[in-house]
Amino acid sequence: MIELLKKIFLVDLFQGLFVTFRNQNPKYIYTEQYPAERPKVAERYRGAPRLNINPDNGETLCISCNLCALACPENLIVVTSERSEVTKRKELVTFTYDTSRCMFCGLCEDACPVDALELTQDFEMASYTREGQIWDRQALEEGPRPTQYKC
């Protein structure tokens, strides 16, 4: 008998509508307007890699020790160097980093003795090709450029 009265008076319908209208209050809405408003990431977030540059002379801080490549469990970092005749030190020739295979563990960053390589808080690394995911030295020094959307 009670079930029949509930069906007649549409109790279930009104309970559902009550829940819907109760959650229409703007203070309960958690939608982010992503392209217009960039989300804040956690302080310890590890995102896009970057090769740091010495601000005094504009050269890279990398000393070509290859420790980052050895520490990487995915073997995605390739460092090549040459010994300079003038300074008798190793100089960085190429530095490639495959972001498509990276799991952003931070082991390469921890292994670097001069803090030349760091994982930034940038998270927009999408590209249309696989070749766009392989960053060379110049791309790593510049860092990712966030896409500018027109709103």
Swiss-Prot record:
Keywords: 4Fe-4S, Cell inner membrane, Cell membrane, Iron, Iron-sulfur, Membrane, Metal-binding, NAD, Quinone, Repeat, Translocase, Ubiquinone. This is NADH-quinone oxidoreductase subunit I 2. It catalyses: a quinone + NADH + 5 H(+)(in) = a quinol + NAD(+) + 4 H(+)(out). Gene3D superfamilies: 3.30.70.3270. Its cofactor is [4Fe-4S] cluster. InterPro entries: 4Fe4S_Fe-S-bd, 4Fe4S_Fe_S_CS, NADH_quinone_OxRdtase_chainI. NDH-1 shuttles electrons from NADH, via FMN and iron-sulfur (Fe-S) centers, to quinones in the respiratory chain. The immediate electron acceptor for the enzyme in this species is believed to be ubiquinone. Couples the redox reaction to proton translocation (for every two electrons transferred, four hydrogen ions are translocated across the cytoplasmic membrane), and thus conserves the redox energy in a proton gradient.
